[in-house]
Amino acid sequence: NYFNACITTDKFSIGEYKLIGQKNIIKSEWASLESSIEYEKVKYLYDVSFVGGESSYRRWFVNELGARGIKVHCFGDRWDNGRVSYEEMEKIFSVTRINLNISNSIQYDIRYLMASPRNILNTLRGKKNKSQVKARVFEIPAQGGFELAEYVPCIEDYFDLGKEIVCYKDVDEAALLINHYLSNSLERESIKRAGVLKARQQHTYIHRIKDFMKDIAIFHEAESNV
């Protein structure tokens, strides 16, 4: 045991730390930079957008939404709009009615797998074999956006689903939710407002640092009393 403490964002790996003799384990999480960008009375530029690198699954997902009449404006590596800076990303989140958060982990939707032999190969070769909460979950609301995220385990530990952010389980549900929230702006804006407040009050990196420094102090005090 060479460390006073270890920090992980994956609560399911805590047991692995214990197996190698690590006693002081801090469960933390990704977060967002602080933001004061305006999110009330916004002039929207996009109905639906996505910011993140292109992947075969994400491309398939966006195309599936397009086949249902839903245009997604995509930004990032290998998308037509290309990369954007952090400042540009902030603005995109705030001027989009519905911000998609599409996972980049291995996907097993049979429709995606059967769409191309390459998709099957990518799945078999993929190293991202489980979905996790990532920084984007917190960045979208912190920067003033309404978030429609793919459900991943433990996301409900940080937001009240359906009241602060909204989650979908597959492309069919995503399409239904997009159409619903585009047609119900008052409900969407209420959820967005609650999500922004939660993210800015509890889920910035300043909050994370303060929390794990408190834990480290507790571990240090306990060891000093031994």
Label each PLM-derived region with a short phrase:
Residues 183-214:
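A charged, aromatic-enriched C-terminal amphipathic alpha-helix characteristic of glycosyltransferases
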Residues 91, 179-180, 197:
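Surface-exposed charged/polar residues within alpha-helices that form helix-capping/stabilizing sites
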Residues 132, 166, 200:
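Glycosyltransferase donor-binding loop in the core domain
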Residues 165-171, 180-185:
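Conserved acidic donor-binding segment of nucleotide-sugar-dependent glycosyltransferases
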Residues 182, 213-224:
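Short, hydrophobic alpha-helical segments
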Residues 1-161, 206, 219-223:
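Nucleotide-sugar donor-binding catalytic core of glycosyltransferases
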